[in-house]
From Swiss-Prot:
It catalyses: iminosuccinate + dihydroxyacetone phosphate = quinolinate + phosphate + 2 H2O + H(+). Its main location: cytoplasm. This is Quinolinate synthase. Iminosuccinate binds at H24, S41, Y112, V113, N114, S129, H197, P198, E199, T214. It comes from Geobacter sulfurreducens (strain ATCC 51573 / DSM 12127 / PCA). Catalyzes the condensation of iminoaspartate with dihydroxyacetone phosphate to form quinolinate.
Length: 304
């Protein structure tokens, strides 16, 4: 089937099903191109909750579709590739987190949204890479348990006077970016600014001109007068950066910055999902309610 025909069929079915198509910033270019909304995982789930769509087609990974289900329990949430998981989210289970909580009684758990619904359900508050510092510093407690990303946790800890207990999780894709990769590119392009995601290793973060979430990268690159940027996050972000800034050059910090799970979803998968109305991601109420509480506490913290 020709790509144009697939796109037409997707658009037709989205209309028929009263569905909204969400694509994460790391998706394949052709999936981002056809999406109704692109963004980071939480922003997408919040946007979806605000729409009057009956069906959410989430082009992302499993925990993202769970977040959409948590925030929109009355909508049908489709994840075109049920095998699109997140290795970092899988590094922590609710049972293991409860054991850690038992070792640190009365210490609040701050959980990065890149986590399963079950883990969110036994957490006190969630955070994103954009608001993690603000979330942690909003808590009155002198200590926090930070789950699951140790790299983001260390980035936050440098901007907080609290004592941190880190879960030993990480994003394998971001972890593949090495300081030597960055130094080599900075030498080759001395006029370029290096911006990276806080999921990168602290040794890489130390080299950055700016550290921010994916949504922060779009804003920074659009408003900064520099004409050349070295990008330290997953390759999918380049699609929109180049689209929005045709006069600027974007260099991926390493060819290893490709997440295999984010690249699983194809246009064919999206079409098949709409045709069959499957696979469905539905978070059970006993997990959804406490998980939503952790997300709601985060959402209630005022933005700058």
């Amino acid at each position: 089937m020709h790509a144009n025909d697939i796109r037409q069929d997707i658009r037709k079915l989205l209309k028929e099903r009263n569905a909204v198509l969400l694509a994460h910033n790391y998706m394949r270019d052709e999936v981002q191109e056809i999406a109704d909304i692109t963004g980071d995982s939480l922003a997408l789930s919040q946007e979806a909750a605000r729409t009057d769509a009956d069906v959410i087609v989430f082009c992302g990974v499993h925990f993202m579709a769970e977040s959409a289900s948590i925030l929109s329990p009355d909508k049908t949430v489709l994840l075109p590739r049920m095998d699109a998981g997140c290795p970092m989210a899988d590094m922590v289970t609710a049972e293991a987190l409860l054991e850690m909580k038992a070792r640190h009684p009365d210490v609040p758990v701050v959980t990065y949204v890149n986590s399963s619904a079950a883990v969110k359900a036994v957490s006190d508050i969630c955070c994103t890479s954009a608001n993690a510092v603000k979330v942690v510093n909003s808590l009155p407690d002198p200590e926090v348990i930070f789950v699951p990303d140790r790299n983001l946790g260390q980035f936050v800890a440098k901007q907080s006077d609290k004592t941190f207990h880190f879960w030993d999780g990480f994003c394998p894709t971001h972890e593949r970016l090495k300081p030597a990769d960055v130094q080599r590119l900075k030498e080759a392009h001395p006029d370029a600014l290096f911006i990276c995601h806080p999921e990168c290793n602290p040794l890489v973060v130390a080299l950055a001109d700016h550290v921010c979430s994916t949504s922060g990268m779009y804003d920074f690159c659009r408003t900064n007068p520099a004409k050349r940027f070295i990008i330290g996050t997953e390759a999918g972000i380049l699609y929109r950066l180049r689209l929005e800034n045709p006069d600027k050059e974007f260099i991926l910090a390493s060819p290893a910055l490709v997440c295999p799970n984010m690249k699983l979803t194809s246009l064919e998968d999206v079409l098949a999902s709409l045709q069959t109305m499957s696979p469905v991601v539905k978070v059970p109420e006993e997990i959804r309610v406490p998980a939503k509480l952790a997300l709601d506490r985060m959402i209630a913290i005022p933005r700058d």
